[in-house]
UniProtKB/Swiss-Prot annotation:
<feature type="binding site">
    <location>
        <begin position="106"/>
        <end position="108"/>
    </location>
    <ligand>
        <name>NAD(+)</name>
    </ligand>
</feature>
<dbReference type="GO" id="GO:0019877">
    <property type="term" value="P:diaminopimelate biosynthetic process"/>
</dbReference>
<feature type="active site" description="Proton donor/acceptor">
    <location>
        <position position="162"/>
    </location>
</feature>
<dbReference type="InterPro" id="IPR022664">
    <property type="entry name" value="DapB_N_CS"/>
</dbReference>
<dbReference type="GO" id="GO:0016726">
    <property type="term" value="F:oxidoreductase activity, acting on CH or CH2 groups, NAD or NADP as acceptor"/>
</dbReference>
<keyword id="KW-0520">NAD</keyword>
<comment type="pathway">
    <text>Amino-acid biosynthesis; L-lysine biosynthesis via DAP pathway; (S)-tetrahydrodipicolinate from L-aspartate: step 4/4.</text>
</comment>
<keyword id="KW-0457">Lysine biosynthesis</keyword>
<comment type="function">
    <text>Catalyzes the conversion of 4-hydroxy-tetrahydrodipicolinate (HTPA) to tetrahydrodipicolinate.</text>
</comment>
<dbReference type="Pfam" id="PF01113">
    <property type="entry name" value="DapB_N"/>
</dbReference>
<feature type="active site" description="Proton donor">
    <location>
        <position position="166"/>
    </location>
</feature>
<dbReference type="GO" id="GO:0009089">
    <property type="term" value="P:lysine biosynthetic process via diaminopimelate"/>
</dbReference>
<keyword id="KW-0028">Amino-acid biosynthesis</keyword>
<feature type="binding site">
    <location>
        <position position="163"/>
    </location>
    <ligand>
        <name>(S)-2,3,4,5-tetrahydrodipicolinate</name>
    </ligand>
</feature>
<dbReference type="InterPro" id="IPR036291">
    <property type="entry name" value="NAD(P)-bd_dom_sf"/>
</dbReference>
<dbReference type="GO" id="GO:0050661">
    <property type="term" value="F:NADP binding"/>
</dbReference>
<keyword id="KW-0963">Cytoplasm</keyword>
């Protein structure tokens, strides 16, 4: 198909990257044109064979900028899907914009000032892009419900649970949820007693709004989040569980299909729904 969307995947051998490659491979309107991963000893290997998908005629490379340069030259309108590491995601996003490859960033860990800088850089390049902390439609619905409930409850805490290989804490999804709840401009969790932590950090991370965020890391988990609200005589709990990374693929493909139509760098899947 001549109208397929060219896709480069960074973090191709990671858990999310592998799922993205499978999804792109089976999507009739997408074409995998690049696969980047820093795993030692895999350079030049066919990514399809590496993932048990059969030969895809796309060789693994560790050369991030080289892959972007090649995609921009041979596949105009290419999209980068990045699931790598918080330490490199800023540079990856900036490089994609510089090469004219539209970024779809699933890697979390970007600081607010970094997001602002990237948005400005994209605007100067007249490009769009998307930074998506969570590609689950169910999680977007939870976030919207949490923002609505925050109007009526003055006490709330957030708990996020992930696998023990996740590098950043709290998760970008949890931070995004808190930000949506804070758009009301209210303060949460007014102290009724003077608290004393006998173990530092026991009460979680404290945001200026008074919201507390708690992070749990355990093997066997994928991605889970709760928002707990408390009122006189009641507790209201919102929870979302992801048991398999396949749950994210509809959101990933939706973003890949829409991102080139954007005129700016956007943050959050809700901006595309």
């Amino acid at each position: 198909m001549t109208d397929q969307i060219p896709v480069v995947v960074a973090g191709a051998l990671g858990r999310m990257g592998a799922e993205v490659i499978k999804a792109v491979h089976t999507a009739g309107d997408c074409q995998l044109v690049g696969a980047i991963d820093t795993c030692p000893g895999r350079e030049g290997e066919d990514v399809g064979l590496a993932l048990g998908l059969g030969e895809l005629e796309v060789a693994l490379t560790q050369d991030f900028e080289g892959a972007l340069c090649l995609a921009s030259q041979q596949h105009p309108g290419a999209v980068l899907v990045d699931f790598t590491h918080p330490k490199v995601v800023y540079e990856h996003t900036r490089a994609a914009i510089a090469y004219g490859v539209t970024p779809v960033i699933g890697t979390t860990g970007l600081a607010p000032e970094q997001l602002q800088e990237l948005a400005s850089f994209a605007a100067k390049a007249s490009m769009g892009g998307a930074v998506i902390p969570n590609f689950s439609v169910g999680m977007v619905l939870l976030q919207q419900a949490a923002a609505a409930a925050a109007r009526f409850y003055d006490h709330a805490e957030l708990v996020e649970l992930h696998h023990n290989r996740k590098a950043d804490a709290p998760s970008g999804t949890c931070i995004k949820t808190a930000e949506l709840m804070e758009e009301l401009g209210k303060q949460f969790n007014a102290q009724e007693v003077e608290e004393h932590e006998t173990l530092e950090g026991s009460r979680g991370g404290l945001r200026p709004s008074g919201l507390r965020l708690h992070s749990i890391r355990l093997p066997g988990l994928v991605a889970h989040q709760e928002v707990q609200f408390g009122g006189a005589g009641e507790r209201y709990v919102l929870r979302h569980d992801t048991f398999d990374r396949a749950a994210y693929m509809p959101g990933v493909l939706l973003t890949v299909r829409k991102v080139r139509q954007l005129g700016a760098l956007v943050y959050g899947l809700e901006r595309l729904l």
